[in-house]
């Protein structure tokens, strides 16, 4: 009884077979069918290779949300060279809460030569070229994000020659931690001293003729320091044409969480607007000579995530390519073969012309029976 039920079940399953097998003796092969099959297999191979390259590629997904972190500190990474001796300049930060962060908390003053060596000039030229391309091709930023920690650092290479020239500039580099409110990082004449109403600089002790705020920004970033990330002001160089010149940078900082297959970092992107002018109180251009970077933080936070096509989606797309090409080429081959047969082979005039009479074995004839040519039945 069980065997009988099993046979019934198997026969029922066989009847439900959606892929019936045609015996090879009933399959007709042709040169045109082989040509179409060759084209189909070649197309499938090319599309499969292209689809696999798409599967291997990644893209950056951007999401936006309100930044709810107000209590943490903001890190500012600085590497700026000013064409003045270190004893003549001072750097510090003053925010909207009147909180002063002195440069002694994390910055190093290093005497150096302002002019770059040949190798350093080549580095600066390449960095400026990348900056110009980034301003035109914004999608290149995705490539930079994905290459983080994958390439070498973008820091200024050390001087390869032992210059006998005495130091005529000051390299200010390091990092500071400030409150997450708008502030002003500035480099001006004289060392900073605390003041009940803010702070002041001892500019009176410096000769006015020694003022020269020509400067080079080798690196400026906010948040966690991520090597190989190029920031908007990296490689910037400004030459002062007057002793009383002020350089201003208005910066909008956007908190950014970066998640790639290489790293995860809490960093910050920023945009900048530059302005420079000569201080002339008689002409109404007031201010103080120096370099001023006024930054403000955006209330929005950007999450940048590197994404990859899931395997199931790749598999479905691959099945669609194979099945679609098989179905389409089969249909096109059938239509083409039908058209060729109509024009050249089957339905020529006279192929179905009836004969006048049909002889039978008993000797009589039938003139009304249509008969194909070469047919004796």
UniProtKB/Swiss-Prot annotation:
GO cellular component labels: COPII-coated ER to Golgi transport vesicle; cytoplasm; endoplasmic reticulum; endoplasmic reticulum membrane; endoplasmic reticulum-Golgi intermediate compartment membrane; Golgi apparatus; intracellular membrane-bounded organelle; membrane
Residue spans, topological domain Lumenal: 55-319
Acyltransferase in keyword set: no
Ranges of the Cytoplasmic topological domain: 1-33, 341-377
Main location (coarse class): endoplasmic reticulum
Tissue expression from the record: Ubiquitously expressed.
InterPro entries per record: Erv, Erv_C, Erv_N
Pfam families tied to this protein: COPIIcoated_ERV, ERGIC_N
Family: Belongs to the ERGIC family.
Function: Possible role in transport between endoplasmic reticulum and Golgi.
Assembly notes: May form a heteromeric complex composed of ERGIC1, ERGIC2 and ERGIC3. Interacts with ERGIC3, the interaction is required for the stable expression of both proteins. May interact with EEF1A1.
Name listed for the protein in its UniProt record: Endoplasmic reticulum-Golgi intermediate compartment protein 2
Source species of the chain: Homo sapiens (Human)
């Amino acid at each position: 009884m069980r065997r009988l039920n099993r046979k019934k079940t198997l026969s029922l399953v066989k009847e439900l077979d959606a892929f019936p097998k045609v015996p090879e003796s009933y399959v007709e092969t042709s040169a045109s069918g082989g040509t179409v099959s060759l084209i189909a297999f070649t197309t499938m191979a090319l599309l499969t290779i292209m689809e696999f390259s798409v599967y291997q590629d990644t893209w950056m997904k951007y999401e936006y949300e309100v930044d709810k972190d107000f209590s943490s500190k903001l890190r500012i990474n600085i590497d700026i060279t000013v064409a003045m001796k270190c004893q003549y300049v001072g750097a510090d930060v003053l925010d909207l809460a009147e909180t002063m962060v002195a440069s002694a908390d994390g910055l190093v003053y290093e005497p150096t030569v302002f002019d770059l060596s040949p190798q350093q000039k080549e580095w600066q030229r390449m960095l400026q070229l990348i900056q110009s391309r980034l301003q035109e091709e914004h999608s290149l930023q995705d490539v930079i994000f994905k290459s983080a920690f994958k390439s070498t650092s973008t820091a200024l290479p050390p001087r390869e020659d032992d210059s006998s020239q005495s130091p005529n500039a000051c390299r200010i580099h390091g990092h500071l931690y400030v409150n997450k409110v708008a502030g002003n990082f500035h480099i001006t004449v004289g060392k900073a001293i605390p003041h009940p109403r803010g702070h002041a600089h001892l500019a009176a002790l410096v000769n006015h003729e020694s003022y020269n705020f020509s400067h080079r920004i080798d690196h400026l970033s906010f948040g966690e320091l991520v090597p190989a990330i190029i920031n908007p002001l990296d490689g910037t160089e400004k030459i002062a044409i007057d002793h009383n010149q002020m350089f201003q940078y208005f910066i909008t900082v956007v908190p950014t969480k970066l998640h790639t297959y290489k790293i995860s970092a809490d960093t910050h992107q920023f945009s900048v607007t530059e302005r420079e002018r000569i201080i002339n109180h008689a002409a109404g251009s007031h201010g103080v000579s120096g370099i001023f970077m006024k930054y403000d933080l955006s209330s929005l936070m950007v999450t940048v995530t590197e994404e990859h096509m899931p395997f199931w989606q790749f598999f479905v797309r691959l099945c669609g390519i194979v099945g679609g090409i098989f179905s389409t080429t089969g249909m096109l081959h059938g239509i083409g073969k039908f058209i060729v047969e109509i024009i050249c082979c089957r339905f020529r005039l006279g192929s179905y012309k009836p004969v006048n009479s049909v002889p039978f074995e008993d000797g009589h004839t039938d003139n009304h029976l249509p008969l194909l040519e070469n047919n004796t039945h």
